[in-house]
From Swiss-Prot:
Region (D): 523-609
Binding residues annotated for Ca(2+) 2, in chain numbering: 166, 217, 226, 260
Name of the protein: Cyclomaltodextrin glucanotransferase
Textual note on the cofactor: Binds 3 Ca(2+) ions per subunit.
Domain notes: May consist of two protein domains: the one in the N-terminal side cleaves the alpha-1,4-glucosidic bond in starch, and the other in the C-terminal side catalyzes other activities, including the reconstitution of an alpha-1,4-glucosidic linkage for cyclizing the maltooligosaccharide produced.
Family label: Belongs to the glycosyl hydrolase 13 family.
Lineage, broadest ranks: Bacteria, Bacillati, Bacillota, Bacilli, Bacillales
Principal subcellular localisation of the protein: secreted
Pfam families referenced in this protein's UniProt entry, alphabetically: Alpha-amylase, Alpha-amylase_C, CBM_20, TIG
Assigned keywords, A-Z: Calcium, Disulfide bond, Glycosyltransferase, Metal-binding, Secreted, Signal, Transferase
Keyword Calcium assigned: yes
Amino acid sequence: MKKFLKSTAALALGLSLTFGLFSPAQAAPDTSVSNKQNFSTDVIYQIFTDRFSDGNPANNPTGAAFDGTCTNLRLYCGGDWQGIINKINDGYLTGMGVTAIWISQPVENIYSIINYSGVNNTAYHGYWARDFKKTNPAYGTIADFQNLIAAAHAKNIKVIIDFAPNHTSPASSDQPSFAENGRLYDNGTLLGGYTNDTQNLFHHNGGTDFSTTENGIYKNLYDLADLNHNNSTVDVYLKDAIKMWLDLGIDGIRMDAVKHMPFGWQKSFMAAVNNYKPVFTFGEWFLGVNEVSPENHKFANESGMSLLDFRFAQKVRQVFRDNTDNMYGLKAMLEGSAADYAQVDDQVTFIDNHDMERFHASNANRRKLEQALAFTLTSRGVPAIYYGTEQYMSGGTDPDNRARIPSFSTSTTAYQVIQKLAPLRKCNPAIAYGSTQERWINNDVLIYERKFGSNVAVVAVNRNLNAPASISGLVTSLPQGSYNDVLGGLLNGNTLSVGSGGAASNFTLAAGGTAVWQYTAATATPTIGHVGPMMAKPGVTITIDGRGFGSSKGTVYFGTTAVSGADITSWEDTQIKVKIPAVAGGNYNIKVANAAGTASNVYDNFEVLSGDQVSVRFVVNNATTALGQNVYLTGSVSELGNWDPAKAIGPMYNQVVYQYPNWYYDVSVPAGKTIEFKFLKKQGSTVTWEGGSNHTFTAPSSGTATINVNWQP
């Protein structure tokens, strides 16, 4: 859904007022900890497990792998799952308003100590896996992990795990003794290592230079042993592994390095998750400053997962931290991303993480960080806060941005900003699901409005730390009345007086000031705010969240196909659970009609899969092209575009695994289905079809396959 609105005249709302101070409402189903498909009402707190809290010193590594002082930031420092449990139970996280935690990859990592340039390195970060079906003992046992899930859920906190199926661990192609040779284990049983890889578990194409997407997918990231996802053993193993963690009760998945794995395989992976136990999943696709990537948008819109919103993060850092852009640039980012992401509310927003310099610099004015937090917490998307941000941690690049959290103070201004604003996501659906509309702007001031039905939040930010701003002519959707700042003046905000037609009285926004004013009202007509997951096969139950659905069952529409009765498994005013009907594969608009027949808004771009999915590598040989031409693939199922050149898969690759004039691409297709397909050449609007009869093959019921054909002139 496109959720950035251009400024328009506000409509007066003749409704009773809810003033700026509020208390959390009783949890509705859409805001429940049991809602694993929707994180729009949540605030995520990212924890680097080893650097947070040592709750069980007995599981600390011994010898040279451990530094209890955390002086060498490339060694283990002792943080574990029991430490996180302790901080859940003592109220530090719940007091901050955190409702989801994202923890380091929990799987067993290598035990070797690797010396790079004279410095010892360990797998403290969790990204050097050896066995995806066992735990990292430095973090805890399976029982400890289960205790973490139970403790978090008891405090209404969801648990997201980092998952890095791109690679195992560092390896050397000519030194089998280096580290652990990238070896991969299946619950303790060795599957193979990087050298003498007779099973072809890994890629052996050298290291990536990041020059092309293909280069980044099929070559190694640095010295990490790159898994071959076109290998059936690897494919089945990774899908079985994530199902194990789903069975343990996780609520979400953060996928590492999604830009560096075959997109078709990842879609089949997400189908495996969504068809089994769907949870909110988001991937890491790094974008640099001012980088806008159509490939990034396409992946978010078609893969079945959302993304970490680096475009958002980089712009927030430019505007609030580095002063290299202004509020017009911030507005342009909001407008552009709303147009480019089909579900912009599902993208995970942040201001820093373990792969970037920390937002705060030790000598910087703290108000910059506090304003960036306020903006992120009240903007579209799912906000994620990196551990220690609330304690003003500073630090440059890896590993300095991964230090041990220095304290657990609840009195810092940053902690209190989060504490005051995080509950809005549960209490006011305008923050969780609403559109975004600029209401007042200059280089230093942005006043924006979030709106969902009759629910409204207005946020004013003056990033100029030295000069106040005189605000006149502000028009909002707030009903007539006086509104207290939700922050209670913590960032020098003020009360807002609103007259008829939403016109605000003139006021002065303090230097460095930030204020949030909000209003809630019952939603009388059905309004969809979120659908999750956004891709699954018929028969899978999906969750529709919003307001005003009513208490009696109505009807859910997938395109023109109506679903009612027993296929709607749950219907409440804020949440509907419905089984996907037996419709053909393809994209559908979803809408809801309540029991009285009143229709909701349309939620678009839902993909019904043609069935369970497998990843298949399509190869076409001797397809010569003119300069500017590329080869694409289409066929008889929706996953291949249903013979529509505009929806064809590609452009295909021709540099790494196969070389020009041979082309290849890994594609997610329905398992066990006989498929007809052809290749075509595209250059702009000109399409040249392959000649001859359609190619035909039957996809495997599980695992992967490669289909290799010659171009038919």
